């Protein structure tokens, strides 16, 4: 790109927040994504693409598979980031995999358009390997470990509730602990969403834009 891309906040025709990086192809993709996903997802994709093109410093049509491997290596060895889980430097495998997904989605969009010089995605699907029986399979570029969710013990929940000083804070934590609400869902609750007679909560803005009652 010859210069560090700058992420600019824009607005769509419908007044919704959008993003632009100053490259026509990237901006076209971000506008496409803006109409198909939630604001948090759009923000993550925009930042992922900004990070990628800042590090690679190439125009989208010039990127090759070697650049993808170089980007993965850079993210794994980023000394400006220290993981809390193990104290090692570099981003987590989950974060790197998400960024690769954003990059892959961008190039899949360019290929699907058919009116750009990009005929195929430079993002490898994975590394080919052979298992027993001669069956080939694909090993992902970044392995994301499967981990069990971390939950609070009853004693920890009791200690947490005991440390809260207001009824509002206790109600928010109870909604998450007993109702399984996500943080963003609790923050999005309005007084009218609390149905006291039915002892239920109406979630208007759940994950993926889905609504539900708990």
For each of these PLM feature ranges, what is it?
Residues 27-43, 49-142:
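N-terminal core-binding DNA-recognition domain of tyrosine recombinases/integrases
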Residues 18-22, 92, 96-100, 179:
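Short, low-complexity cationic-aromatic patches
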Residues 12, 16-17, 23-30, 52, ...:
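Aromatic/pi-system hotspot detector in well-structured domains
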Residues 25-26, 68, 77, 153, ...:
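N-terminal alpha-helical segment
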Residues 1-36, 148:
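N-terminal DNA-binding module of tyrosine recombinases/phage integrases
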């Amino acid at each position: 790109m010859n210069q560090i891309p700058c992420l600019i906040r824009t607005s769509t025709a419908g007044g919704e927040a959008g993003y632009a990086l100053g490259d026509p192809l990237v901006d076209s993709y971000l506008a496409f994504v803006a109409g198909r996903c939630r604001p948090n997802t759009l923000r993550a994709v925009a930042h992922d693409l900004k990070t990628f093109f800042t590090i690679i410093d190439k125009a989208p049509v010039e990127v090759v598979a070697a650049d993808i491997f170089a980007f993965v290596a850079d993210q794994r060895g980023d000394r400006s980031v220290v993981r809390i889980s193990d104290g090692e430097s570099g981003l987590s495998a989950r974060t790197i995999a998400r960024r690769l997904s954003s990059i892959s989605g961008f190039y899949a969009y360019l290929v699907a358009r058919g009116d750009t010089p990009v005929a195929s995605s430079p993002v490898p699907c994975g590394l080919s390997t052979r298992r027993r029986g001669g069956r080939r399979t694909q090993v992902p570029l970044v392995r994301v470990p499967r981990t069990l969710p971390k939950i609070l013990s009853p004693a920890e929940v009791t200690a947490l509730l005991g440390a809260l000083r207001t009824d509002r804070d206790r109600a928010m934590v109870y909604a998450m602990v007993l109702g399984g609400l996500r943080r963003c869902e609790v923050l999005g609750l309005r007084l009218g969403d609390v149905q006291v007679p039915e002892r239920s909560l109406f979630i208007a803005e759940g994950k993926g834009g889905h609504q539900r009652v708990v």
